[in-house]
């Protein structure tokens, strides 16, 4: 009987599929983590491990060096020659890009030796380049005062020092009431011309705020002050984007204006050369300058769209705008609407998009059209003949 009991074996309890899967899944996950970690470590220290094991990863091969291995030959004997050439190219680009925007009563060019007072916080905070890939090393750039002095102008040092020490940033300006008696006294000795520098720092991913596309209240007050103390005012437009410039015609003594853009590392000297006529400005505007930024199709379309539960890597609070202008951006919009208005097509002459909320009128919307630019040269056309074919 005892032998029979021994022969009767108790059945083994089988492991459930769920438990089996859980155990092996965990083991495989740990194994995978270990493999990935080991792979990362081995890749990071592959060179050290290879050298420790005595393996070679580089083989030295004796090649025939009798031939010419200089595939890209430089046209310059030394780096100094190359730098001198690039400097000249930079200055040429700036010189040929400067646009003469306004020149009433032939206010420009100025005579060398003119005694000038340079106004505006931007005079000592001049923009040389944009941001991102458009930024430059400003360590050794030439200042506006240095450039004008080099070109034979006598610059008001007292006024220049005031702006250097003001501690303000564009578009804030030293208020007229804060001009010291010493500064105001200096105008008599440097009163041939006042130069006002207008600047804005917009660049890719950093568009201007609405209040920055026109004169700030500080700048308006400063221009009123300048006009009260000087009979001739010249404006330098240190900008790379289209802003509202109607104010150039609102101050009696603003007689000339030059769009100078951003001069880069070496282009600054070309600005006073354009002012004194060494360079004849031949540039043309590459944007349409409207009286009001609100008249553009983009402004009509722009809005503060939000994406619920969205994410924006640059921290723009999940904002978005649907691009709806198509090709009608800049001059394509203004010139097309002008043609449609003249031809009476569609509702182009409606007040929609008009800055004065009246019938749309090209002359009231566009201050400087695409491709605009004056010259010191006087042109004359005569002896026209028309032949009917």
Range-by-range predicted roles:
Residues 1-389:
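C-terminal non-catalytic regions of proteins with extracellular/luminal or membrane-system context
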């Amino acid at each position: 009987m005892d032998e029979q009991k021994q022969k009767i074996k108790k059945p083994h309890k089988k492991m459930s599929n769920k438990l089996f899967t859980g155990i092996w899944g965990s083991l495989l996950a740990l194994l995978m983590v270990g493999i990935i970690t080991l792979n990362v470590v081995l890749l990071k220290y592959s060179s050290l491990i290879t050298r420790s094991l005595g393996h070679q990863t580089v083989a030295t091969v004796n090649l025939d060096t009798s031939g010419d291995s200089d595939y890209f030959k430089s046209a310059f004997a030394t780096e100094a020659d190359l730098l001198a050439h690039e400097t000249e190219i930079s200055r040429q680009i700036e010189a040929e890009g400067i646009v003469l925007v306004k020149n009433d009563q032939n206010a420009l060019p100025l005579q060398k030796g003119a005694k000038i007072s340079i106004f505006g916080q931007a005079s000592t905070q001049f923009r040389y380049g944009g941001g991102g890939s458009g930024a430059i090393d400003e360590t050794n750039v030439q200042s506006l005062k240095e450039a004008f002095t080099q070109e034979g102008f006598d610059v008001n040092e007292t006024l220049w020092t005031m702006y250097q020490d003001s501690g303000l940033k564009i578009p804030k300006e030293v208020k007229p009431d804060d001009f010291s008696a010493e500064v105001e006294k200096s105008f008599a000795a440097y009163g041939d011309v006042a130069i006002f520098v207008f600047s804005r720092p917009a660049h890719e991913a950093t568009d201007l705020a609405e209040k920055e596309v026109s004169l700030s209240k500080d700048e308006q007050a400063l221009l009123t002050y300048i006009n009260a103390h000087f009979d001739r005012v010249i404006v330098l437009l240190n900008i790379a984007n289209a802003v509202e410039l109607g104010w150039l015609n609102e101050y009696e003594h603003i007689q000339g204006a030059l769009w100078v853009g951003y001069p880069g590392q070496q282009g600054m000297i070309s600005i006073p050369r354009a002012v004194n006529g060494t360079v004849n400005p031949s540039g043309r505007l590459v944007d349409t300058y409207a009286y009001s930024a609100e008249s553009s199709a983009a402004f009509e379309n722009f809005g503060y769209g939000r994406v619920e539960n969205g994410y924006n890597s640059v921290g723009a609070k999940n904002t978005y705008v649907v691009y709806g202008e198509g090709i009608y951006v800049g001059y394509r919009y203004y010139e097309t609407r002008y043609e449609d208005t003249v031809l009476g097509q569609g509702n182009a002459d409606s007040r929609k998009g008009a800055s004065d909320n009246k019938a749309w009128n090209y002359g009231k919307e566009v201050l400087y059209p695409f491709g605009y630019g004056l010259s010191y040269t006087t042109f004359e056309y005569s002896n026209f003949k028309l032949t009917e074919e």
